[in-house]
Amino acid sequence: MTVKTRASIAKKIEKDGLDSQYLFMDPNEVLQVQEESKKIPYKMEIVWRNVALFAALHVAAAIGLYELVFHAKWQTAVFSFALYVFSGFGITAGAHRLWSHKSYKATTPMRIFLMLLNNIALQNDIIEWARDHRCHHKWTDTDADPHNTTRGFFFTHMGWLLVRKHPQVKEHGGKLDLSDLFSDPVLVFQRKHYFPLVILFCFILPTIIPVYFWKETAFIAFYVAGTFRYCFTLHATWCINSAAHYFGWKPYDTSVSAVENVFTTVVAVGEGGHNFHHTFPQDYRASEYSLIYNWTRVLIDTAAVLGLVYDRKTIADEFISRQVANHGSEESRKKSIM
């Protein structure tokens, strides 16, 4: 299916009630970006500082993995796993489903909780993360997409963080309306104090807690609960940009690169239903996977029971079925309802 064909499909989707603001791909703008890119001479410029920092991180993570396997106390292993899961929620339930897509609403205490979890993940402040993610959805697989899959698996996975952004990313990202993000005092606070927050939550507390509560050595605590856990969480998130656009099936829209991928659903705490998500980005569930796989939905639903979350947006099953019949694959959909 061509992008031009998707333009007519998009009109049909909007008429059926799917608000496009937060955000599914705008086919007409995709065509425009593709034409503009042909006129822009571009050569990737490596940011060597980032290369050095990520290289150092992976060396530290390798040390952490060794210490985890051979020397760390079991409490440190459990603690590191908990940090990985909850920092993941700071991305999936927070930066992604709440702030990037507005797929549900949360009370101030819940927003503060998710912001604090997001600091453990250290993946840029939420405003910047959401801006890049909205670019990714609105101009998927073009030069305005920060992790454009047409540039290869490594670029999509982490290479995009090692080079300067394409001019189209800067130009079109600057046109997005981010007033909803800048009007949230929780996000403004995080952005203003981001460096001390992430140093405290991503590295200092993960080191101090094991040392204080179960007498782990500071060396092991830092490298296991700090650097290894952080690096593993990064790759789990990056797998959504890479593996979830390359390896899997397409039940809901065969024209997009995003796929359903069970592995990424597991490692990214519920984000692997990516073909569903790119087709219905405002659905807070982000997939049709069962709760066994969609831990982020479990968190959001639990918070709703506690009165911390409300106005969870979903797409009607009849509309999903119609979308599958017209533009997807019913046989593939069966794999996504597990």
From Swiss-Prot:
Principal subcellular localization: membrane
Membrane topology: Multi-pass membrane protein
Catalyzed chemical reaction(s): octadecanoyl-CoA + 2 Fe(II)-[cytochrome b5] + O2 + 2 H(+) = (9Z)-octadecenoyl-CoA + 2 Fe(III)-[cytochrome b5] + 2 H2O; hexadecanoyl-CoA + 2 Fe(II)-[cytochrome b5] + O2 + 2 H(+) = (9Z)-hexadecenoyl-CoA + 2 Fe(III)-[cytochrome b5] + 2 H2O; heptadecanoyl-CoA + 2 Fe(II)-[cytochrome b5] + O2 + 2 H(+) = (9Z)-heptadecenoyl-CoA + 2 Fe(III)-[cytochrome b5] + 2 H2O; (11E)-octadecenoyl-CoA + 2 Fe(II)-[cytochrome b5] + O2 + 2 H(+) = (9Z,11E)-octadecadienoyl-CoA + 2 Fe(III)-[cytochrome b5] + 2 H2O
GO cellular component, one term: endoplasmic reticulum membrane
Keyword Repeat attached: no
Coiled coil: none
EC number: 1.14.19.-, 1.14.19.1
GO MF annotations, alphabetized: iron ion binding; stearoyl-CoA 9-desaturase activity
Protein keywords: Fatty acid biosynthesis, Fatty acid metabolism, Lipid biosynthesis, Lipid metabolism, Membrane, Oxidoreductase, Transmembrane, Transmembrane helix
Chain segments annotated as transmembrane: 51-71, 76-96, 194-214, 218-238
GO biological process, one term: fatty acid biosynthetic process
Traits of the deletion mutant: RNAi-mediated knockdown causes a significant increase in the abundance of C18:0 fatty acid, as well as a decrease in the levels of C18:1n9 and C18:2n6 fatty acids. Slight reduction in polyunsaturated fatty acids (PUFAs). Widespread vacuole formation, germ line necrosis and shortened life-span.
Cellular localisation: Membrane
Domain of life: Eukaryota
Tissue-level expression: Expressed in the intestine in adult worms and in all four larval stages.
UniProt pathway: Lipid metabolism; monounsaturated fatty acid biosynthesis; Lipid metabolism; fatty acid metabolism
Signals that turn on the gene: Expression is regulated by nhr-80 and nhr-49.
Comment block on domains: The histidine box domains may contain the active site and/or be involved in metal ion binding.
Family stated for the protein in its record: Belongs to the fatty acid desaturase type 1 family.
Miscellaneous notes: Cytochrome b5 CYTB-5.1 is specifically required for the desaturase activity, its knockdown or mutation alters the enzyme activity.
The protein's role, per its UniProt record: Delta(9)-fatty acid desaturase that acts preferentially on stearoyl-CoA (octadecanoyl-CoA) producing the monounsaturated oleoyl-CoA ((9Z)-octadecenoyl-CoA), one of the most abundant monounsaturated fatty acid in Caenorhabditis elegans phospholipids and triacylglycerols.
Name used for this protein in its record: Delta(9)-fatty-acid desaturase fat-7
